[in-house]
């Protein structure tokens, strides 16, 4: 395995796609894999985790920092930029074992050849640090001009987000620092040590500051001029290049926000200076060492299938890039740190699709993700109250403080160009159960019950109260129902008794009962605290009653099929191809009140199948199989979340040959850059961390058959026919275990740390 992804395409679509595919990041920030000379029309972005802004009536979205990677060149008064001037050769190369992006471009001029090389990484050791090494070589004598500095004209979807931009320049000479207040021209004879550039960009909404500092070290003296406008501050470096002489410089960049610390300016400069003293090679070595530590536990080896092996580990690379290791309470957005799609909001994706990877390899990160939900409980309670419910109704698109960024109008009609009313925010009530499922999974795997006293217990109980307040009972009926919801499918809105939603509500009731019982027996002091906060006896009686009487759709008479929601089987039963043929526009939204799928049995993504994966022990094998056979041909898989659930259920039915294509669809979601990029006229492109997490779940839990049974690791592999071996490690309750599975045998061994 060479751990390298390469690409040479330069068409507009490839440039956008490569921004996602060649992303580097360290959890604090993500840097799209665009070239140094690209301006905002090519979607460059240094996307920041957990900080947002709203401009006017536009959608609230995460911030992209001013671009301090910006660099362009002129050779003998000719600008050499991609894609403006076609190169003789060009390649992007991502070392996804170590998060290093390399670029090589070769141009032919009328005098000879010009070669540009660059290498960048977002330091995994120092979260605020980004390093770029850049070189230019011509095979003839020429004048080379490099423009490099900070581009403050940032790509935004609903921006611009900075209402005030202030540049600061410092001239460094013989350990002296002089603040420059105007454009400055220096000759190389002035014994120049460099200019350090900074930008302070202030947001509209909260007046937060994003502070970016950069400095360079160059291997050759130059004539230097500072060029400043409202949106950029650049050095103009003029070199007298000799034939085959490499001009090389390293940029040391720091990114801070005013949310990080009070003295962000001082810290920014301090880290840049330390980085310069440390040097490029040493910084890269330290960065690579952190990556090696991560891969020591998380690498998965698939023998007999190089494509699957590469794609899966590349998927895990993307999860590592966006893991908030720097925080005690932060989650992961649906598109990671690849941009502002979906408003940089946190969805159910994190708990249901990504959590297992972190739980099995970095439990402390899993706890960080869950703490985010605990810390946004008040926002969930406010939302529930707003809609007239009790307890905690979590945000469908969660931002700071649990604020729900989801709009009432998420889709634009392609024909009228008018916004369409959608009900994701109002009716996808299954979101709260995802948080409970995540906490329950964490408790079961880690046996770390401290999270309950840190707010986890209250979170579970408030979610249980929320679902109890949703229950309805028809006159003359003994069971409860849940009406007017949207299940995972999403194309069918405002339905009654969605099977997944109802079963997850029951899981929430069960979990609340379980944790109250646990705390009563294990932590009397904390239980007494809960007694003071809640009417525990009354609450327990209600939850037990709800558990016993909540209607969960069961297989129909004379059939093993479970109806997705009331009346689903009465909808038009038509093929996926027929529904697709009814589209009048390629970007037309399939769901909602008038979508082509809305009145048919065609669904967007796994719904009943997701329920069966989570609660497989409650159903006979034939029920699992028949529902797979029925729902899969009717599923569009319009979401990257869908394929892994079908893959998992096929594995549970001992059909790895059918699971494999769905596994590969998840694993290749970002590798090949062919993910869905539009919902109506709304751009939804970016990386797909839920698909990455889904690929991991399928490999480990599906093909690998990994599970914890009574505190003991078990593995019952169901490998695809062409797989020779599946090997992986997990961190379980403080110890590393290696599971090595072939078709003949399985070994589980404890690894000394």
Swiss-Prot record:
Location in the cell: Cytoplasm
Gene3D superfamilies: 1.50.10.10, Glycoside hydrolase, family 65, N-terminal domain, Maltose phosphorylase, domain 3
pH dependence, record text: Optimum pH is 7.0.
InterPro entries (UniProt xref): 6-hairpin_glycosidase_sf, 6hp_glycosidase-like_sf, Gal_mutarotase_sf_dom, Glyco_hydro_65_C, Glyco_hydro_65_M, Glyco_hydro_65_N, Glyco_hydro_65_N_sf, Malt_Pase/Glycosyl_Hdrlase
Catalytic activity as recorded in UniProt: nigerose + phosphate = beta-D-glucose 1-phosphate + D-glucose
Residues forming the catalytic site: 490
Chief location of this protein within or outside the cell: cytoplasm
Enzyme Commission number(s): 2.4.1.279
UniProt keywords, alphabetically: Cytoplasm, Glycosyltransferase, Transferase
Enzyme class: transferase
Temperature-related behavior of activity: Optimum temperature is 40 degrees Celsius.
Positions bound to substrate: 348-349, 604-605
GO CC terms: cytoplasm
Similarity comment text for this entry: Belongs to the glycosyl hydrolase 65 family.
Stored PANTHER family: GLYCOSYL HYDROLASE-RELATED, PROTEIN-GLUCOSYLGALACTOSYLHYDROXYLYSINE GLUCOSIDASE
Reported function: Catalyzes the reversible phosphorolysis of nigerose. Also shows a weak activity on kojibiose.
The name this protein goes by in its record: Nigerose phosphorylase
Species this protein is from: Lachnoclostridium phytofermentans (strain ATCC 700394 / DSM 18823 / ISDg)
């Amino acid at each position: 395995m060479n751990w390298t992804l390469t690409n040479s395409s330069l068409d507009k679509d490839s440039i956008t796609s490569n921004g996602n595919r060649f992303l580097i990041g360290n959890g604090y920030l993500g840097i799209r894999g665009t070239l140094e000379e690209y301006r905002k029309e090519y979607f460059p972005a240094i996307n920041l985790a957990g900080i947002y802004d709203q401009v006017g009536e536009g959608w609230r979205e995460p911030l992209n920092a001013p671009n301090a990677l910006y660099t362009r060149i002129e050779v003998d008064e000719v600008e050499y930029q991609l894609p403006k001037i076609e190169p003789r050769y060009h390649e992007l190369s991502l070392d996804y074992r170590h998060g290093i992006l390399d670029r090589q471009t070769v141009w032919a001029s009328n005098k000879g050849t010009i070669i540009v090389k660059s290498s960048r990484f977002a330091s995994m050791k120092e979260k605020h640090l980004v390093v770029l090494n850049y070189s230019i070589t011509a095979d003839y004598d020429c004048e080379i001009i490099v423009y490099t500095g900070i581009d403050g004209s940032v790509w935004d979807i609903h921006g611009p987000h900075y209402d005030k931009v202030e540049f600061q320049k410092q001239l460094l000479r013989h350990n002296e620092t002089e603040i420059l207040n105007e454009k400055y021209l220096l000759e190389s004879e002035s014994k120049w040590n460099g200019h350090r550039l900074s930008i302070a960009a202030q947001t509209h909404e909260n007046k937060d500051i994003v502070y970016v500092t950069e400095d360079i070290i160059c291997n050759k003296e130059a004539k230097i001029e500072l060029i400043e406008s409202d949106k950029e501050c650049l050095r103009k470096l003029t070199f007298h290049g000799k034939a085959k002489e490499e001009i090389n410089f390293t940029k040391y960049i720091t990114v801070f926000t005013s949310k990080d610390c009070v003295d962000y300016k001082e810290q920014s400069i301090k880290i840049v200076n330390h980085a310069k003293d440390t040097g490029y090679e040493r910084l890269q070595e330290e960065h690579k060492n952190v990556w090696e530590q991560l891969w020591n536990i998380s690498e998965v080896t698939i023998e007999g299938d190089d494509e699957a092996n590469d794609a899966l580990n590349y998927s895990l690379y993307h999860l590592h890039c966006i893991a908030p290791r720097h925080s005690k309470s932060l989650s992961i957005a649906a598109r990671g740190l690849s941009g502002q799609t979906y408003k940089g909001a946190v969805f159910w994706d994190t708990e249901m699709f990504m959590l297992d990877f972190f739980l099995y390899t970095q439990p402390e990160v899993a706890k960080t993700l869950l703490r985010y939900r605990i810390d946004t409980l008040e926002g969930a309670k406010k939302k529930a109250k707003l809609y007239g419910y009790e307890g905690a109704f979590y945000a469908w698109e969660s931002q700071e403080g649990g604020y729900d960024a989801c709009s009432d109008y998420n889709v634009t009609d392609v024909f009228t160009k008018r916004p369409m009313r959608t009900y994701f925010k109002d009716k996808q009530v299954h979101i709260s159960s995802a948080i409970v499922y995540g906490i329950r999974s964490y408790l079961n795997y880690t046996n770390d019950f401290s999270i309950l006293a840190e707010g986890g217990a209250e979170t579970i109980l408030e979610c249980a109260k929320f679902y109890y307040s949703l229950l309805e009972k028809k006159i003359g009926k003994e069971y409860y129902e849940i009406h007017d919801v949207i299940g995972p499918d999403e194309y069918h809105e405002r339905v009654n008794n969605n099977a997944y939603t109802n079963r997850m509500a029951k899981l929430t009731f069960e979990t609340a009962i379980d944790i109250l019982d646990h705390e009563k027996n294990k932590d009397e002091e904390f239980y007494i605290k809960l007694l003071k906060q809640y009417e525990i006896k009354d609450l327990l009686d209600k939850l037990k009653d709800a558990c016993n009487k909540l209607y969960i759709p069961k297989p129909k008479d004379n059939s093993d099929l479970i109806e997705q929601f009331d009346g689903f089987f009465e909808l038009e039963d038509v093929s996926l191809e027929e529904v697709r043929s009814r589209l009048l526009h390629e970007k037309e939204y399939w769901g909602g009140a008038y979508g082509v799928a809305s009145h048919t049995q065609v669904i967007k993504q796994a719904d009943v199948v997701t329920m069966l994966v989570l609660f497989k022990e409650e159903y006979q094998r034939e029920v699992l199989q028949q529902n797979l056979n029925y729902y899969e041909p009717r599923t569009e898989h319009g979401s990257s979340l869908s394929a892994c659930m079908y893959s998992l259920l096929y594995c549970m039915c001992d059909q790895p040959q059918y699971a494999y294509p769905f596994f590969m669809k998840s694993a290749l979601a970002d590798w090949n850059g062919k993910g869905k990029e539009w919902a109506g006229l709304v751009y939804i492109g970016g990386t797909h961390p839920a698909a990455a997490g889904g690929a991991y779940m399928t490999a480990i839990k599906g093909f690998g058959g990994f599970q914890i049974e009574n505190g003991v690791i078990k593995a019952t592999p169901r490998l695809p026919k062409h797989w020779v071996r599946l090997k992986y490690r997990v961190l379980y309750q403080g110890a590393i275990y290696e599971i090595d599975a072939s078709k003949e045998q399985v070994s589980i061994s404890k690894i000394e740390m």
